[in-house]
Amino acid sequence: MFDIVPIRIFGTSSIGVFLATNNSVTFLPPDVPEKIDDIVRNTLRTTVARLTVAKSPLLGIFTVVNDNGVLLPPMVLEEEIRLFKALGLNVEVLNTKYTAISNLILAGNKVALVSPLLEPSVRKVVADVLGVEVIVDTIAGNPLVGSLAVLNSRGVLVAPEATDEDLKKLAEYFKAKTDLGTVNKGKSFLRGGIVVNDHGALVGDETAGPEFMRIQQVLG
């Protein structure tokens, strides 16, 4: 059963900027209403951890997570790092000039597509902490690879700017089906509107019927 549930957080359908998940835990900001905890547990079938990065609720922008580990940006606070480590995941702070690291890394459990913008010295850390093979590439010539696609072990949903060539490459990299899709009535910033793992997906509440169907086809 792969459920797709529409939600709104802090008055916006851009839920993916606030949440991040793998197959066992979902990161939520401290001020999200309790009822969202239940939706997360029932849909993504994970535990819930309430966290911040640099006191910000933007966990979906400032973390990269898979089933093996979590990457954090340079401005994360020591006490926050301790809370991430308490979850039992590999945790590492990336020594990079970038803060919105989720825009630069599209991470599965075996492979991570990494933006050419990310410093070469950081790539090895990505590989080690997430336990993945690192591939450096763009999507449709855009280096913000983590913002233009979402994935689980079954599929990769990619923004409509992607070419057939992009879809073919991504299918090869991640060994999964790929297709184009949007969220929240035509938005191609997929990471901003979809929070997905192998069990289910949360989507922004502006997501339309055909978008639901495509998400189900590719990721469900």
Swiss-Prot record:
Signal sequence segment: none
Any Pfam family the entry gives: eIF-6
Superkingdom, taxonomy of origin: Archaea
Gene Ontology biological process terms, A to Z: cytosolic ribosome assembly
Protein biosynthesis listed as a keyword: yes
InterPro entries cross-referenced by the UniProt entry: eIF6
GO molecular function, one term: ribosome binding
Gene3D superfamilies referenced in this protein's UniProt entry, alphabetically: L-arginine/glycine Amidinotransferase, Chain A
Alphabetical keyword list: Initiation factor, Protein biosynthesis
Function: Binds to the 50S ribosomal subunit and prevents its association with the 30S ribosomal subunit to form the 70S initiation complex.
UniProt family annotation: Belongs to the eIF-6 family.
Record protein name field: Translation initiation factor 6
Organism per entry: Pyrobaculum arsenaticum (strain DSM 13514 / JCM 11321 / PZ6)
Taxonomic lineage: Archaea, Thermoproteota, Thermoprotei, Thermoproteales, Thermoproteaceae
